[in-house]
């Protein structure tokens, strides 16, 4: 029984860590991320659509596509990761909390990179994902010889270039904890 519950609790905990870093470090300092999270941040900064809601809206069509390609069994942990992340984001969006890092974007990007990297690593090591670009990378990996880690790096790079074009702020894109933590989490999982 404990073996079945432990991965579930672990994925939920990882989602909480990731959502905490995103809500309290990335968003207040207008930093960005790659992948689907980057798209949710674009919509938040431009249109004030809550990150928690946009995370779900982006993932619904991706899950439908992945369901058709991979079948239902392989998606349960990803559904749990995505749903948990959206719930934690919604919870943290309602809890006002500030950390005085005196606007030091280097420290902010390091702290957010560590939190997001740990959160993703915990989720991945428990067999889950946060959906989004992870699903896109898995689908592309199925039909190419490119590793999931390299595909994620390419997707993240593309989103960051889109962010640079839209917001024209190289400084914020540079301070973004680029996909390095994401890439390292996949190396830990053994997908490179």
Feature names for model-found ranges:
Residues 46-56, 108-110:
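Structural signature of hydrophobic alpha-helical transmembrane segments
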Residues 62-73, 126, 138:
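C-terminal ends of transmembrane helices
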Residues 31-36, 125-136:
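Juxtamembrane/interfacial segments flanking transmembrane helices
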Residues 38-45, 134-142:
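Short amphipathic alpha-helical coupling elements at transmembrane boundaries
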Residues 83, 87-91, 106-126, 147-148:
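Mid-bilayer segments of alpha-helical transmembrane spans in multi-pass integral membrane proteins
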Residues 31-40, 94-101:
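Membrane-interface helix termini and inter-helical loops of multi-pass transporters
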Residues 181-188:
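Conserved small/polar residues in nucleotide/adenosyl-binding loops
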Residues 20, 42, 63-65, 87, ...:
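Alpha-helical transmembrane segments of multipass membrane proteins
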């Amino acid at each position: 029984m404990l073996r079945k519950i432990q991965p579930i609790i672990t994925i939920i905990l990882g989602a909480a860590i990731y959502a905490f870093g995103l809500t309290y470090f990335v968003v207040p300092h207008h930093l960005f991320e790659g992948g689907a999270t980057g798209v949710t941040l674009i919509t938040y900064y431009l249109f004030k659509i809550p990150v928690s809601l946009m995370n779900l809206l982006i993932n619904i069509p991706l899950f439908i596509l992945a369901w058709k390609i991979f079948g239902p069994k392989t998606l349960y942990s990803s559904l749990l990761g995505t749903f948990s992340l959206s719930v934690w984001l919604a919870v943290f969006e309602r809890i006002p909390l500030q950390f005085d890092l005196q606007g030091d974007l280097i420290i902010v990007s390091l702290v957010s990179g560590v939190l997001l990297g740990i959160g993703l690593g915990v989720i991945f090591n428990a067999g889950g994902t946060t959906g989004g670009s992870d699903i896109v990378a898995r689908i592309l990996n199925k039909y190419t010889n490119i590793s999931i880690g390299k595909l994620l790096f390419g997707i993240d790079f593309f989103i960051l270039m889109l962010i640079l074009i839209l917001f024209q702020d190289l400084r914020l894109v540079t301070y973004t904890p680029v996909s390095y933590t994401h890439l390292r989490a996949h190396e830990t999982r053994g997908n490179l």
